[in-house]
């Protein structure tokens, strides 16, 4: 268990204040459902639409039936482990990780059709064979995956839903933290990146009170700087240009 000292105190203090001020509401109203509410986007170009019609069906996960015994069965060529990225946006991070780790399978969940079209173009261009895609409800996907099967879950610059009445749409909720604990292997990781201080505080507060996770930070630089080989997304670069510093939070699933 990490001892929170002065090296990590700034963000920990923020989380504690945020928890006292806001998270004392009854979270029973934060029912599991769609954590995404903005699926519309720009009109697709002809080739993008063609990829959505013809390539996506070969890569898309169908969760209306039972899950496989292990998610590695979803990939050909075979993989050794599987990771999940939720809300991959333009796909920069997911593509880079898939290329860097060919023996790992990746599931990318994204509700925006424009994001799907962008990543399909990169998958076609790079001939990537270790990515599967999911365009539905992330909560339903988390409930479907086999227990203790994922090596890692990434949530990179998610929609912060800043208005209080929309907080129930944030991905990080107590119920979803429990779902991640069920899905992750022992010592698997949940990694979270955001340049929105209030969402960082929200996430840290939820994970610090979760019995199945440990925050891995031992010094301030562990959350102030990206982890090694992190691929900055287009949104991340935009945030830096505008003077917003992201936090890079890592939480490890405790062994049973």
From Swiss-Prot:
Q: What is the enzyme's class at the highest EC level? A: transferase
User: Keywords on this record?
Assistant: Methyltransferase, S-adenosyl-L-methionine, Transferase, tRNA processing
Species assigned in the record: Rhodopseudomonas palustris (strain HaA2)
**What Enzyme Commission number does this protein have?**
2.1.1.33
Highest rank taxon of the organism: Bacteria
Keyword Disulfide bond assigned: no
**Descriptive protein name:** tRNA (guanine-N(7)-)-methyltransferase
Repeat listed as a keyword: no
Pathway per the UniProt entry? tRNA modification; N(7)-methylguanine-tRNA biosynthesis
Per the entry, what this protein does is: Catalyzes the formation of N(7)-methylguanine at position 46 (m7G46) in tRNA.
Family annotation (HAMAP family)? tRNA_methyltr_TrmB
- Pfam families, A to Z: Methyltransf_4
Q: Where does substrate bind?
A: 163, 195
Q: Per UniProt, what is one GO molecular function of this protein?
A: tRNA (guanine(46)-N7)-methyltransferase activity
**Catalytic reaction annotation:** guanosine(46) in tRNA + S-adenosyl-L-methionine = N(7)-methylguanosine(46) in tRNA + S-adenosyl-L-homocysteine
Q: Residues that bind S-adenosyl-L-methionine, according to the entry?
A: 85, 110, 137, 159
User: Can you tell me which residues form the catalytic site?
Assistant: 159
PROSITE patterns per UniProt: SAM_MT_TRMB (PS51625)
What the entry lists under PANTHER family is as follows:
3-DEOXY-D-MANNO-OCTULOSONIC-ACID TRANSFERASE/TRNA GUANINE-N 7 - -METHYLTRANSFERASE, PENTACOTRIPEPTIDE-REPEAT REGION OF PRORP DOMAIN-CONTAINING PROTEIN
GO terms under cellular component: tRNA methyltransferase complex
| Protein family per UniProt | Belongs to the class I-like SAM-binding methyltransferase superfamily. TrmB family.
């Amino acid at each position: 268990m990490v001892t929170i000292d002065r090296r990590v105190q700034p963000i920990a203090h923020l989380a504690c204040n945020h928890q006292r001020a806001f998270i004392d509401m009854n979270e029973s109203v934060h029912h599991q459902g769609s954590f995404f509410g903005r699926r519309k986007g720009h009109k697709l170009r002809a080739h993008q639409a063609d990829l959505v019609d013809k390539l996506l069906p070969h890569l898309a996960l169908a969760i209306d039936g039972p899950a496989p015994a292990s998610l590695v069965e979803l990939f050909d060529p075979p993989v050794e482990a599987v990771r999940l990225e939720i809300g991959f946006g333009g796909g920069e991070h997911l593509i880079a990780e898939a290329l860097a780790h060919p023996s790992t399978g990746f599931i990318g969940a994204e509700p925006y059709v424009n994001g799907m079209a962008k990543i399909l173009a990169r998958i076609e261009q790079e001939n990537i064979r270790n990515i599967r895609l999911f365009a539905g409800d992330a909560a339903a996907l988390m409930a479907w995956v086999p227990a203790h099967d994922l090596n890692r879950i990434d949530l990179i610059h998610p929609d912060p839903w800043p208005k209080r009445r929309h907080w129930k749409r944030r991905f990080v909720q107590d119920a979803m933290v429990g779902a991640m604990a069920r899905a992750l292997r022992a010592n698997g990781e949940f990694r979270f990146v955001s340049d929105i201080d209030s969402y960082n505080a929200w996430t840290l507060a939820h994970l610090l009170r979760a019995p199945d996770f440990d925050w891995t930070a031992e010094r301030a630089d562990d959350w102030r700087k990206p982890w090694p080989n992190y691929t900055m997304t287009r949104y991340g670069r935009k945030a830096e240009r505008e003077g917003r510093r992201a936090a890079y939070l890592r939480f490890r699933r405790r062994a049973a």
